[in-house]
UniProtKB/Swiss-Prot annotation:
Transmembrane regions: 8-28, 52-72, 92-112, 137-157
Cytoplasmic side stretches: 1-7, 73-91, 158-175
Native organism taxonomy: Eukaryota, Viridiplantae, Streptophyta, Embryophyta, Tracheophyta
Entry membrane topology: Multi-pass membrane protein
Taxonomic source organism: Arabidopsis lyrata subsp. lyrata (Lyre-leaved rock-cress)
Listed name of the protein: CASP-like protein 2C1
């Protein structure tokens, strides 16, 4: 049980590291170029999906840090209510990070390929550093989402090991 708890803490720290690194790449990335004698600056604020991803990353990193803190000071709990809450929040965080990252990837693909119908120019021919950093941030977010799926499976194990395999929704100790 101690190894499982250590694994959970290490996973949460890795998730926080990848998410904060991705947030720094998204939030601090901007590039200015002169196009047709006009200075054009591009940043994450022009792509709403990237801005939403930044806010999602901050909330999920804070949640994981709070969970690390609660696990650090909390004694083993015998009831299932906090474990259910942790399981549901871990699931929600994993889904939200994956959905936000997928939306940011789709929006970024529009920036890479452009769209004549929407009159979007291909930014990556002009702003290559910006595009490479956004691509790196999206890859880091997908790694964090995969780690969060693994973490939510550990959370599910911690929850469902409390229940009896023979009686539906009965604790092992009560059977």
């Amino acid at each position: 049980m101690v190894r499982l708890r250590e694994t959970e803490v290490i996973l949460r720290l890795c998730i926080v590291f990848f998410i904060l690194l991705s947030s720094c790449l998204i939030g601090l990335d901007s590039q200015t170029k002169e196009i047709a004698y006009i200075h054009k600056k591009v940043s994450f604020r022009y792509l709403l999906a990237l801005e939403a991803e930044l806010y999602i990353n901050v909330v999920v990193a804070a949640y994981n840090l709070v969970q690390i803190g609660l696990g650090w000071y909390n004694v083993e709990q015998k009831t299932s209510n906090p474990k259910w809450f942790s399981y549901l929040l871990d699931q929600t965080a994993a889904y939200v990070v994956f959905a936000g990252t997928s939306a940011a990837a789709q929006h970024s693909l529009l920036v890479v390929t452009g769209s004549r119908e929407l009159q979007w120019m291909k930014w990556c021919y002009k702003f290559t550093r910006f595009c490479f950093q956004m691509g790196s941030a999206i890859i880091l977010n997908y790694i964090a989402a995969a780690l969060m799926v693994l973490l939510s499976s550990i959370s599910a194990f911690n929850l469902f090991r409390l229940y009896s395999p023979k009686r539906f929704f009965s604790f092992k100790s009560s059977s």
